[in-house]
UniProtKB/Swiss-Prot annotation:
It holds the Pfam family DeoRC. GO terms for biological process: fucose metabolic process; regulation of DNA-templated transcription; regulation of fucose catabolic process. It comes from Escherichia coli (strain K12). This is L-fucose operon activator. The keyword Magnesium does not apply. Keywords: Activator, Carbohydrate metabolism, DNA-binding, Fucose metabolism, Transcription, Transcription regulation. It comes from the Bacteria. Residues 19-38 bind DNA. Residues 1-57 form the HTH deoR-type domain. Transcriptional activator of the fuc operon.
Length: 243
């Protein structure tokens, strides 16, 4: 019965741009709580996307909802710069850190002093920025440049990471949904973040308030896997970490 109901939800979403939980509840004659449970399962399976009380079907040929890097740089830039500045306190001489290709980490790289650390990243803009520092040992993931996101895609990433003991992985994401799942706008960046999240000794999530209660096209992991979080919405961030 549940499988049939969930397929009915998918069928309805295929014929609409998006639908609310209430609309699905009325269509299928079940409670909103039942619909929410079904939507959570369908989202975990990667079939639908939930955002602000609405659900839409993910068309497999177009699993990429992200903005280009230069657009993301301008979005909430003051908050991102402040969050990045706070993250500097977590970085010490001698550390091996990894950065993702997010605009928030680019703001961090801009403010990073020229100290004796190793930095591993898949970000082309961050490589360009940190290439100006003489004491920072910069390690690029290499691979094919995905220009839209300013990141490198390397199928040999797993073997490359075997020789690196990463002390701290600093990253951002497209959103955190109500269940604590971490999402990104595309599979390219989500795969990189998921891998680093598992390998690093500690992780530091940098996220501005616009990202809470949002999902995306590709799942990174869960907030349970993150050791620390910095946000401009401290109350929400604290409740998520302690939940």
């Amino acid at each position: 019965m549940k499988a049939a109901r969930q397929q009915a939800i998918v069928d309805l979403l295929l014929n609409h741009t998006s639908l609310t939980t209430e609309a699905l509840s009325e269509q299928l004659k079940v409670s909103k709580e039942t619909i929410r449970r079904d939507l959570n399962e369908l989202q975990t399976q990667g079939k639908i996307l939930r955002n602000h009380g609405r659900a839409k079907y993910i068309h497999r040929q177009n699993q990429d909802s992200g903005d280009p890097f230069h657009i993301r740089l301008k979005s909430h830039y003051a908050h991102k710069a402040d969050i990045a500045r706070e993250a500097l306190a977590w970085i010490e001489e001698g550390m091996v850190i990894a950065l993702d290709a997010s605009s928030t980490c680019w703001y961090l790289a801009r403010q990073l002093p020229d100290i004796n650390i190793q930095v591993f990243t898949n970000s082309h803009p961050i490589c360009h920025e940190l290439g100006k520092r003489e004491r920072i040992q910069l390690i690029s993931s290499g691979g094919t440049l995905e220009r839209k996101y300013g990141c490198y895609v390397n199928p040999s990433l797993i073997s490359q990471l075997k020789s690196l003991e990463i002390d701290l992985f600093i990253f951002s994401c497209e959103g955190i949904d109500s269940s604590g799942a971490l999402w990104d706008s595309n599979a390219i960046n989500a795969d990189y973040k998921s891998m680093l999240l598992k390998r690093a000794a500690q992780s530091l999530l940098l996220i501005d308030k616009s990202k809470f209660n949002r999902s995306g096209e590709a799942r990174i992991g869960h907030l349970d896997e993150v050791t620390h979080i910095i946000s401009d919405e401290r109350q929400v961030a604290t409740s998520l970490v302690t939940a």
